[in-house]
């Protein structure tokens, strides 16, 4: 629709006091934001001229040269109040489009109201002469733009007006001619086989039992390819020795499918068991640590206060996203246990208390003589956990006892983090 300025709608011309002293347009052309700004000496300009003037390097009133800033302009409330009281025609008195650049009054169909400028916004929202689009759908091409008070007349010819179907009461556009023929579930139709009349919603249930409908033998899967009307089904099934051969074919096919299903089930069961084992082992770690040149390490790491921090350590390893290693004191961790081998498990990161189950085993060439110990404990304060007196040195280091083989000592270890399940609680 054409945009109208207030100056286009004035009933009477206004005095110069309501015009901008620079461009001579009205001080405000918009009805939704009427604001008259003035310089400190009372000179009034429209908002566009004030903006241009302040964007100029001089930033001054064009009349009195007073320095101004947009945010510091004062409002002329008297002029604003007087301006709002002036009379204008409703913009819907005019035709929607200009002709030759001019607005044209619609003497026959336009709004005849004369209102104050301050009433324009409220009036425009409620004016029955306002232009609207057809509310029945964007597809409407016949007079799809009209005045609000012409809606009832428009609906008489609008093919997109939705009216309740006389059978199912569903709102349907008048142009939808196919509704009764293909959609309406409450419309009566005839079965194409037996010609019985029924509601469309009843047809699918009827077709399951219609005696005139042509069907295939229910033993088609077994090889019978005959088609017949449903009412002849009993006679057909009695033929071919009661279809015993076809029934046997179906049984054989089902047996083959059953065997294949059984094989598939066994494969899935095997995969399930494999995955279950992997899940069980995901919280376990086992390995062995081979310490070469063992007897020399026994000599190089004596038990005394000076060397008590010396040890043999295995390479770092990762388990459950944490870094660990194992350390061995060939002659004990402290003088009090100098006759024993000390073994410890270490966690190399700051971590809350972790409950851990682990075992060490010093391997003997005779598996029945291997020395194995288990423990369930917590890591605390970054200290290792293990045994100060794991095994007597003389037992391990005596040649011929089977622990040191080829000057190598082998220590197996296994780590497990027990899974804890919080109890279910209802408050």
UniProtKB/Swiss-Prot annotation:
Domain of life: Eukaryota
A Pfam family matched in the record: zf-TRAF
One term of GO molecular function: zinc ion binding
Signal peptide feature range: none
Keywords from the named record: Cytoplasm, Metal-binding, Repeat, Zinc, Zinc-finger
Family annotation (PROSITE patterns): MATH (PS50144), ZF_RING_2 (PS50089), ZF_TRAF (PS50145)
UniProt similarity note: Belongs to the TNF receptor-associated factor family. A subfamily.
Lineage: Eukaryota, Amoebozoa, Evosea, Eumycetozoa, Dictyostelia
Stored PANTHER family: RING-TYPE DOMAIN-CONTAINING PROTEIN-RELATED (PTHR10131:SF156), TNF RECEPTOR ASSOCIATED FACTOR (PTHR10131)
Domain notes: The MATH/TRAF domain binds to receptor cytoplasmic domains.
Zinc finger region(s), RING-type: 20-65
Keyword Zinc: yes
Protein name: TNF receptor-associated factor family protein DDB_G0285149
UniProt-annotated location(s): Cytoplasm
Zn finger limits (TRAF-type): 122-178, 178-234
Biological source species: Dictyostelium discoideum
GO cellular component terms given for this protein: cytoplasm; nucleus
Sequence ranges assigned to domain MATH in this UniProt record: 284-415
CDD domains, sorted: MATH
Functional summary from the UniProt entry: Probable adapter protein and signal transducer that links members of the tumor necrosis factor receptor family to different signaling pathways by association with the receptor cytoplasmic domain and kinases.
